[in-house]
Amino acid sequence: QKRYEEAQSPYQRAAETFNELERDFPRVVRYQERAARALMGLGLVQRNSGKPVAAEKSYRQAIAKFEAMDRARGLTPASIDVLAACYNNLGNVHVDAENIEEGLVAFQRAITLRQRLTDVPYPMPSARYGLHRAQGNYANAYQKLHDWDRAHELLVAVFEDQRSLVQDHPGNRSFESHALWLFARIADGLRATSRGEELPPFADTLTQLLPQRPDVPAQVAYHLALTAGDLDDPETEAERELKDQLAQRAIAGLEAALQLGWQPEDPLAEEDAFQVLQQYDEFHALID
């Protein structure tokens, strides 16, 4: 947080400087754009410094400048990208404050802007990634509202699109990490709705997509174990079988992660998600 607070002053000075230049030279477009970009950066550091009200104000000021430019002469693709980021970040501020409905509106606006960049014959990979991030945040907001079915539908769609993006651009860590984030949100939703039996296919898709990243099978194992933990006292034979299946897959995932060089900072047995695995000999053989 201290690092973000230290970054606030340069962004503040930049915003003030370009605002003055914009007032003195209203026809110079680059001053308007730079003032708006500085405000967006200021909002980012304010949010990460624990100042959501100030961040919202900065984002709204940046949005107002970009949208005025858009009405007057249109925006370059680069400026559309920054405007979409402003709306996406504004949505995050609203969700942080549990103003979920307002967050949905902001995320939808970000999606609409991103689609201006992706609805072309050959969209830039970064534009596709930006769209998927906004769509993921939009779906996550529905989870906050406990509209699990709607959230799951949206998450599955964007997970598939993100899988395609990762396949098209192997080795991009940001693209890969977002696929992992989407998987985690899908797992959260399936646990919340007692649909743990639907998780393994998504786990398979992710591990096949990123076979060389040791953190992927480790994270997959975590969510499988967490899901198995929800079946702590299975009442039926089917539930007992599902619990065992999920636990065994979690153990296999940990084994794969360790073989790829993953080294957990803390003993796995201390993690709440792995308590359910304590009863399995294979788990103890793996970590002892």
Give each language-model segment a name.
Residues Q1-D288:
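Alpha-helical protein-protein interaction modules
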